[in-house]
């Protein structure tokens, strides 16, 4: 288990670029965090965190692909879900390419 500041490190991905997140997790030799993002027909989003993140350092990787507004809301809702799940720190990683 990779640790950061003595805490477990977890990496989650939004829907924008799962391949990039998987490559980062493979490099770090850790599994990608389990989460589910549901987009409803009325464009509302629901994010479910599928594992324990209590007292972990969590990184969320989300690129700004189209539709940008939806991807940013997805990121913010995921951060909120992680904080409500008692993650110690949540860091957003937004690569731009």
Go through the PLM ranges and name each one.
Residues 1-97:
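PRPP-associated nucleotide enzymes
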